[in-house]
């Protein structure tokens, strides 16, 4: 598949998921479609050789949406049986997700080559020489220093030189702030759920305790009703 055809397919998936989000009432389906949209957008970034931004979109946006999905499940009373019955109607989205994953793997396979360690290559070369499979020839060998400086990836440049190098302290502080925010929201949500359950238990009517507390009045009212 050509790059243009892959981009058209990913854009079509994004447009379809956007229309589903606009028409959907259930927030869970909206979140699932958002995850598909971000995955397709990360695939588009991989096709234009922006690996670092693609990884950031997957880690930050999809991770944040997964946490939001968890909060919605915690705060909304959702029947699991209804979800399972409704998910049977959305098999097309599973097919779209599989196509997106296959496309992403195709991009990774076409853009990256498998790197073999130099020790393995050296051992294999010595095996070929000793077994006289290949004949040695006098060929000039040199080291291309230009390729060492030019042929680099976006992830290596941004990660090793910028984030984990010059701005490592700020990166660690941002991670700590995000962790505090996630833990704080989970703690507040859990307290609200426990308080709501306690309030419902208090409002529950216990007939035995009411009868024992006002036994004479209950017997009298029962006799008068007859």
UniProtKB/Swiss-Prot annotation:
This is NADH-ubiquinone oxidoreductase chain 6. Belongs to the complex I subunit 6 family. Keywords: Electron transport, Membrane, Mitochondrion, NAD, Respiratory chain, Translocase, Transmembrane, Transmembrane helix, Transport, Ubiquinone. One of its GO terms (molecular function) is NADH dehydrogenase (ubiquinone) activity. It catalyses: a ubiquinone + NADH + 5 H(+)(in) = a ubiquinol + NAD(+) + 4 H(+)(out). The keyword Protein biosynthesis does not apply. Core subunit of the mitochondrial membrane respiratory chain NADH dehydrogenase (Complex I) that is believed to belong to the minimal assembly required for catalysis. Complex I functions in the transfer of electrons from NADH to the respiratory chain. The immediate electron acceptor for the enzyme is believed to be ubiquinone.
